[in-house]
Amino acid sequence: MERYAIGIDLGGTSVKYAVVASSGKMPFSGQLPAFAQESAEAVLGQVLKGVEACREYAVSEGLMLAGVGVGTPGVVSADGRTVLGGAENIAGWENIPLAGRVEEAEGLKTLAGNDANMMALGETLFGAAKGATDVVFVTVGTGIGCGALMDGRLYRGYRNRGMEMGHITVKCDGEGCACGGVGCLEHYASTSALVRRFCELNGSARDAEVDGKDVVLFYKEGNPAAVQAMEEHWNYLAHGIASMINLFAPQRVVVGGGISEAGDFYLEKLREGVRRQMMSVCGEETELVAARLGNRAGCMGAAGLVLDKMG
């Protein structure tokens, strides 16, 4: 018998929402602007609109909902109730009683979790890591997020405060990062970093019209600045992934984010770099694959969390 839950994926630009079935089907979904630079209340309002749209659909179709799962940037309390902080892309997003606010407004039991963890769970339950018990999920975008499952369970660190792969040090004498650290992986290997580095090497000002897909296109055309920027990107990202393999020895590393969809050549170059840098005994059974769910992973993982805990 199919069971259903609402999955919300909150990001810096949008709020994605969906009704998700235990089989992985997604009969209803949508997206709203996040208003992330306005205020925490504005963001909460958009989350609630997404939940309400899903609830109305479920009522119209006669579907019973197990509850609501919300994937959010930042650190979430161990009980899945409160966003403690660490979401640099959402203004004022700290000490937010997220689960309580949704429950109060919609009358549905709610759990929150870190967005990368929810994506990792989504890919493990329904996507590229289905059937695996030990998985590392890496998302490469404006930042770098990471989630992991060990023995089939999300690994979050003590009180949900771990797995900030984007802020491991890859250059000990490197530049400062927005987190306050120095030489962070995110500062050198994110898509934002790739574009910034391309512009530096190309002798041009940072162009708002240039994005990661453009740099990939320039790389394919043989543009020297793009070639060097991409090689540096792969090297830094491989360093970070190899470190995760050495620590966790996962069955699969799933790489998501828009740039991971650049083509097979992108993943193959990354695999080459990872093989050079990892301990072979740690990664001899690790498969590095592209994410399969695209921008659905966060909603599907958040709903999957609720179906597991409340269904």
List where the protein language model places each region:
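Glycine-rich phosphate-binding loop of actin/hexokinase-like ATP-binding domains
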Residues: 130-188
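Glycine-rich beta-strand-to-loop/alpha-helix junction loops that act as flexible
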Residues: 68-74, 255-259, 291
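Short glycine-rich, Thr/Ser-proximal phosphate-binding strand/loop in the N-terminal lobe
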Residues: 2-49, 82-85, 160
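Glycine-rich phosphate-binding/hydrolytic loop that grips phosphoryl groups
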Residues: 20, 111-124, 261-311
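Glycine-rich phosphate-binding loop and adjoining helix at the ATP-binding site
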Residues: 36, 40-48, 52, 63-68, ...
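A mobile "lid/hinge" subdomain adjacent to the ATP/sugar-phosphate binding pocket shared
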Residues: 20, 185-254, 286-287
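Short glycine-aspartate micro-motif
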Residues: 5-9, 65-69, 135-139, 145, ...
